[in-house]
């Protein structure tokens, strides 16, 4: 066969094979495009269904809130202490909408050391009795919370497994080990009946606050980000809400005794406050707890309260400041969860011109959703809220916003449920039997003890 003919034959064959390959590739590409189109279509359908479901849940939550008596709605803003350590007994009744002598139960209860028995069985029975009372009186369950930071600030010290202070954790454990530690603690908290932990402390430690924090901080800004995130995710993965504290910070003055006054340089504020809280806000913490401190930042001047006739023009503690709550925490840093005050009976407020009733009004207008009180009675503060709610449109709007945020939290963390058949918000199903929960508690405690035994932590 002549050379040119052979070359042409090879060229023809090559072109033929190339055509077949191109056709095959086009076919594969078309099939891939079709698969991708169908995948995107399915994803859009799922996303649409998810959005539709969220809209239904949101509408159902609004209806649920509207169905509540005013007494119960307004009470959602308060988190108070309670009597005893064995069986729940409410202490206050009020008249509401023609109904006489109705039990007044807050949105949440905080447990202190004297509320904690040294026997896990009694603690779990006590928390059960709180929920039983709410159910038997057709009330929304209050959330149950405590401080379990670690070290000396741990209401379950000696009952649950070892929980070292934050400083020790950052020095001795990796982030993965810290996540395991806090996960085991969360399982124990949940088994005993607690819904929310007022922890972790995510203040960056410096010379100005080291004496007050005393081991409660993870240390540097980097450590706060790494270990604060580990703690936050560990608790909330195990269905215990976490509350970051204290924003925007403290100094060496103990707010239980006096009013802290802080001044940040612009760079210091960005490094030690804004950046850590903004980053951690992306992990969707259930709450942030405000500090009772007068705070200013160089270049911004003294931050004054705004929109509060009774406090106009006065320097205001961060816990009562619309600037720090609405403008900075929510606006700039993007936080979407619950805002907690610190205890309004601390000397930082009470001895510096903000007695409880004035503090309650200021906190609500500033954007606080949960007013923390170490007292066991709150009828006086509740009556003030009721009076202002009925006569002040701005106050009413702030209360309505807070009530909805609290109820959304309760829905998200299982104190309320969305019934798909009736499309209504209903009380959560009863928790597992006490025996089963205690089995979880002791199992997690054993693992907790074994994990820290090599460090001499018991």
Go through the PLM ranges and name each one.
Residues 83-87, 115-118, 148-153, 196, ...:
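Solvent-exposed loop/turn segments at secondary-structure junctions
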Residues 4, 28-100, 321-324, 331-332, ...:
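Preference for extracellular/luminal or secreted protein segments
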Residues 75-82, 107-111, 142-148, 196-200, ...:
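Hydrophobic faces of well-ordered beta-strands that scaffold small-molecule active sites
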Residues 94-112, 184-196:
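Catalytic domains of carbohydrate-active enzymes, especially glycoside hydrolases
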Residues 119-131, 135, 223-236, 240-398:
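Second-shell residues forming the walls of enzyme active-site clefts
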Residues 4-15:
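Bacterial N-terminal signal peptides that target proteins for export
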Residues 131-161, 181-204, 224-249:
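Glycine-rich, aromatic-flanked loop segments that form ligand/cofactor-binding clefts
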Residues 15-24:
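Bacterial N-terminal signal peptides
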């Amino acid at each position: 066969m002549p050379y040119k003919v052979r070359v042409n034959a090879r060229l023809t064959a090559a072109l033929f094979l190339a055509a077949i390959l191109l056709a095959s590739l086009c076919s594969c590409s078309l099939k891939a495009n079709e698969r991708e189109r169908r995948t995107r279509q399915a994803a859009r359908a799922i996303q649409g269904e998810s959005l539709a479901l969220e809209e239904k849940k949101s509408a159902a939550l609004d209806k649920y809130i509207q169905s509540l008596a005013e007494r119960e709605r307004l009470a959602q803003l308060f988190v108070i202490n309670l009597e005893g350590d064995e069986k729940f007994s409410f202490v206050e009744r009020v008249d509401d909408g023609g109904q006489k002598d109705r039990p007044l139960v807050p949105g949440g209860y905080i447990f202190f050391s004297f509320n904690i028995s040294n026997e896990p069985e009694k603690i779990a029975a006590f928390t059960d009795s709180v929920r039983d009372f709410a159910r038997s009186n057709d009330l929304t369950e209050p959330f149950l919370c405590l401080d379990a930071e670690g070290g000396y600030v741990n209401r379950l010290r000696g009952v649950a497994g070892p929980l070292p202070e934050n400083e020790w954790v950052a020095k001795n454990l990796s982030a993965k080990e810290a996540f395991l530690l806090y996960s085991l603690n969360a399982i124990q908290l949940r088994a005993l009946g607690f819904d929310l932990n007022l922890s972790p402390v995510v203040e960056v430690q410096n010379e100005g606050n080291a004496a007050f924090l005393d081991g409660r901080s993870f240390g540097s800004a980097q450590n706060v980000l790494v270990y604060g995130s580990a703690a936050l995710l560990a608790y909330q993965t195990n269905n215990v809400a976490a509350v970051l504290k204290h924003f925007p910070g403290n100094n060496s003055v103990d707010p239980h005794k006096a009013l802290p006054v802080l001044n940040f340089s612009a760079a210091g504020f960005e490094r030690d406050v804004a950046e850590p809280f903004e980053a951690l806000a992306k992990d969707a913490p259930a709450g942030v707890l405000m500090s009772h401190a007068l705070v200013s930042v160089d270049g911004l001047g003294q931050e004054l309260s705004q929109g509060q006739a009774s406090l106009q023009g006065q320097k205001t503690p961060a816990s009562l400041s619309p600037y720090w709550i609405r403008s900075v925490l929510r606006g700039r840093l993007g936080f979407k969860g619950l805002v907690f005050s610190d205890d309004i009976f601390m000397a930082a407020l009470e001895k510096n011109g903000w007695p409880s009733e004035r503090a309650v009004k200021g906190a609500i207008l500033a954007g606080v959703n949960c007013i923390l009180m170490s007292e066991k009675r709150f009828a006086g503060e509740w009556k003030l809220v009721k009076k202002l709610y009925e006569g002040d449109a701005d106050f009413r709007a702030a209360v309505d916003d807070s009530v909805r945020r609290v109820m959304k939290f309760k829905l998200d963390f299982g104190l309320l449920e969305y019934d798909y058949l009736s499309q209504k918000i209903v009380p959560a199903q009863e928790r597992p039997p006490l025996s089963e929960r205690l089995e979880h508690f002791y199992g997690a405690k054993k693992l907790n003890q074994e994990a820290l035994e090599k460090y001499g932590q018991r």
